[in-house]
Design a protein with these regions (language model features):
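Structural signal for membrane-spanning alpha-helices in multi-pass inner-membrane proteins
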Residues: 24, 28, 90-97, 124-131, ...
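Interfacial loop-to-transmembrane junctions
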Residues: 222-247
């Protein structure tokens, strides 16, 4: 049984790593008006089409020592880190949701809820990378996140109201604040929290916003202290919101229980 669990864990890890590898490609292609679903992956230096042995998550980068097998160009460690993160989050989603809403015959012990959560994590990866590069969040990614939220409501239709409230409880105040303070939040950030709120429900949405503000505030203080930005400069807030969403999704229940007990 232990050997089987280890094998299933490895498969889940590779599934998450493969998804994040693809979403990394999405994050690179979308800002460049390239179709993420068309065309094979190529080496950015020599343009050689990558074969199956070059695309095995994690192991290809390690086996090739971070270099293209054709031209020897260095492959950024970001690719390895993204795939490792995807693997870890796949295990985290399985731990959090298990086989809830199990698939017929099962899928490596993962149910619909765990797979949906992993898909949300993959979308948030692309959102974070694109926002960090361009300070914009593509509408199609927010739409994909909203679809995940709608599916989560369909999986548990009796709990639809907390999800609807979640879509509004943070996004509406963000929008109203923008009416008072020009540029307080980007439009993409507002849509992001509306879509994420539909998936999370209102309690975890508030928690996600809290963590996003804390992380973003700490980064802003660092930029000011290091004199890398002025008081009126803007920076991408999306990555911090995404981090808050993932934390709330995986650990929201225990954190809220601890907070209520503390009160």
């Amino acid at each position: 049984m232990l050997l089987l669990e280890l094998l299933l864990g490895l498969i889940r890890f590779l599934l998450g790593a493969a998804l994040f590898s693809f979403m990394n490609v999405v994050a690179w292609r979308l800002p460049r008006d390239m179709d993420p679903l068309k065309g094979r992956s190529v080496c950015p230096q020599c343009g050689h089409t990558l074969g199956a042995p070059d695309l095995v998550p994690v192991f290809s980068w390690l086996f090739l020592r971070g270099r293209c097998r054709h031209c020897g160009a260095h492959i950024p460690v970001r690719y390895l880190l993204v795939e490792l993160l995807g693997g870890v989050l796949a295990l985290g989603c399985t731990w959090r949701y298990g086989a809830a809403y199990a698939l017929p015959g099962g899928l490596f012990g993962m149910g619909w809820a765990a797979l949906l959560a992993l898909a949300v994590c993959g979308i948030l990866l692309s959102v974070s990378l694109i926002d960090a590069e361009t300070q914009t969040i593509p509408d199609r990614l927010n739409l994909a996140l909203a679809v995940c939220g709608a599916v989560s409501v369909l999986l548990s239709p009796a709990d639809w109201l907390p999800h609807i409230i979640g879509a509004l409880c943070v996004s509406v105040p963000m929008f109203l604040l923008c009416l008072v303070i020009d540029g307080a939040f980007g439009g993409g950030d507002i849509k992001l929290m509306a879509a994420a709120g539909l998936f999370l429900g209102w309690q975890n949405t508030l928690l996600a916003m809290f963590f996003g503000i804390v992380f973003g505030g700490m980064y802003g203080i660092y930029l000011l202290a290091a004199k890398k930005a002025g008081k009126k400069d803007h920076f991408a807030f999306g990555p911090f919101l995404c981090a808050g969403i993932v934390i709330a999704m995986l650990f929201g229940g225990p954190v809220l229980e601890w907070y209520c007990a503390f009160l």
